[in-house]
Amino acid sequence: MKRKHKRLLFTVVTFAIFGMSVVVVLNKLQNNISFFFTPTEVLSNAIYNNNRDIRIGGMIIKGSVEKHDDFISFYITDLENHMKILYKGILPPLFSEGSWIVAKGKMVSSEFIADEILAKHDENYKPSKYKTK
C-alpha cells in the first residue's frame, strides 16, 4: 500500500470510530434528557402509547389535590387542558396547589401514574424580610 492510501485508510477508520462513539453516547443520554411535555401535547398526540417513561409538566389546579390512604391524586394544567396525576411517595417540600411541577412516569388509560415529582420554584429570589403576602 502506498503511503497516501494508508493515510486515507487511517482517516476513514478514525472518523468511523468517532462517529460510532457519538452515536453510542447520544443513545445512552437519550433517557436522561430533561424535556417535558404539556398536558395538551400528551392529549393531542400518541406520545404515551409506548411504554417509555415521559415527563409531563404543568400547574397544579387549586382544589384538585386529594389525599388517599396510599397515594395522592391531583390535576395539572398548562392553562389549556388538564390531566389527572396519581403519585405514591413523598411529595417535595415546594409541592402546593398553584405551583408548577414536572412528573415522570407512564400514561395508563387517561391517567398519568407518576414515579417521581419535581416541584419547580420561582426563579426570583427575595429575602424573607422583603417578601409580601
UniProtKB/Swiss-Prot annotation:
Q: What is its main location?
A: membrane
Give the Pfam families listed for this entry: CcmE
Binding annotation for heme: H121, Y125
Q: Which GO terms describe its biological process?
A: cytochrome complex assembly
| UniProt KW Heme keyword | yes
Which regions span the lipid bilayer? Answer: 8-28
One GO term of the cellular component aspect?
plasma membrane
The alphabetized UniProt keywords are: Cell inner membrane, Cell membrane, Cytochrome c-type biogenesis, Heme, Iron, Membrane, Metal-binding, Signal-anchor, Transmembrane, Transmembrane helix
Look up the signal peptide feature and give its range: none
User: What does the UniProt record say this protein does?
Assistant: Heme chaperone required for the biogenesis of c-type cytochromes. Transiently binds heme delivered by CcmC and transfers the heme to apo-cytochromes in a process facilitated by CcmF and CcmH.
Protein name as annotated: Cytochrome c-type biogenesis protein CcmE
This protein's gene is called: ccmE
